[in-house]
């Protein structure tokens, strides 16, 4: 199985205003200790943006700050021009922002369909419509709708977590290391799945330790280091930047993930 590089994304000038903007974010978990130190990010409509960098760079903290799970001390987050800084996760879901955390957070004693229902309160007709959409994205779940989530494989649990985040038809989806803990084959499937969701009209920010794979599918990438922006460019440009390769990627593998029609 191979992953092809995405074509260079249209420049931000061609895309109008950002759908989501994080501006000069300063945030942390302990009083007086900052993990983010003036971090910036723009996500344009229809874009797939990757965030990479070394451990402790602030990648996951940036997603948590956007999704209201870490308090932003200074700076702002806007969605469609509306200030959403430090709003609670439920309020962000209502505004069209979904999030899949690292640990997936599926409910093992509930069925797949019951887990998907936890994504939001929908009328029966709307739930059925969204369920059809999610099963189309994740056909492996079709015959497992009544199966308890605790009996699923890691890759299948991740599908459930993604499906639950998509249940409310978000404009923006935040993915925190979706390939973590998966086999190489399942990782490749995850990146194909992520691109498929993006092609269905969802703008995505993906944080990844598997930097090479993330850059192969993303339109643009941000390299974070010590809570700051170190590099920003298209995924292709970052993959071929000698300094980025030396500091963050190592020797690039020749294998690629083939696009899924």
Q: What is each of the regions a protein language model found here?
A:
Residues 2-261:
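Glycine-rich phosphate-binding loops of nucleotide-dependent enzymes
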């Amino acid at each position: 199985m191979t992953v092809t590089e995405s074509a260079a994304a249209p420049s931000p000038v061609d895309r109008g205003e950002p759908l989501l903007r994080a501006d000069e974010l300063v945030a942390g978990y302990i009083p007086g200790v900052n993990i983010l130190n003036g971090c910036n990010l723009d996500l344009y409509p229809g874009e797939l943006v990757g965030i990479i960098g070394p451990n402790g760079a602030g990648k996951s903290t940036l997603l948590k700050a956007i999704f209201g799970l870490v308090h932003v001390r200074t700076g702002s987050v806007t969605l469609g021009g509306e200030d959403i800084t430090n709003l609670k996760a439920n309020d962000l879901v209502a505004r069209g922002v979904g999030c899949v955390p690292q640990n997936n957070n599926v409910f093992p004693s509930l069925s797949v369909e019951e887990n998907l229902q936890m994504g939001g309160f929908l009328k029966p007709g709307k739930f059925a419509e969204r369920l059809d959409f999610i099963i189309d994205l994740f056909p492996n779940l079709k015959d497992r709708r009544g199966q308890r989530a605790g009996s699923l494989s890691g890759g299948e649990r991740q599908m459930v977590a993604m499906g639950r985040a998509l249940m409310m038809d978000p404009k923006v989806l935040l993915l925190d290391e979706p390939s973590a803990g998966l086999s190489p084959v399942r990782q490749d499937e995850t990146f194909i799945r992520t691109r498929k969701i993006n092609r269905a009209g969802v703008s995505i920010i993906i944080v990844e330790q598997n930097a090479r794979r993330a850059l192969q599918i993303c339109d643009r990438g941000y390299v974070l280091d010590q809570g700051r922006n170190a590099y920003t460019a298209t995924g292709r440009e970052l993959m071929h930047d000698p300094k980025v390769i030396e500091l963050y990627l190592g020797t690039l593998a020749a294998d690629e993930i083939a696009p899924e029609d």
